[in-house]
């Protein structure tokens, strides 16, 4: 979802 999606 977020461009920096690391699982947050």
From Swiss-Prot:
One cellular component (GO) term of this entry: extracellular region
Subcellular location: Secreted
Keywords: Amidation, Neuropeptide, Secreted
One GO biological process term: neuropeptide signaling pathway
Tissue: Brain, subesophageal ganglion, retrocerebral complex, thoracico-abdominal ganglion, peripheral neurosecretory system and intestine.
Modified residues (Leucine amide): 8
UniProt family annotation: Belongs to the allatostatin family.
Purpose: May act as a neurotransmitter or neuromodulator and play a role in the integration of information within the brain. May be involved in the control of visceral muscles due to its ability to behave as potent inhibitors of peristaltic movements. May also fulfill a neurohormonal role on muscles of the gut and heart.
Protein name (record): Callatostatin-4
Species of the source: Calliphora vomitoria (Blue bottle fly)
């Amino acid at each position: 979802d977020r461009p920096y999606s690391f699982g947050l």
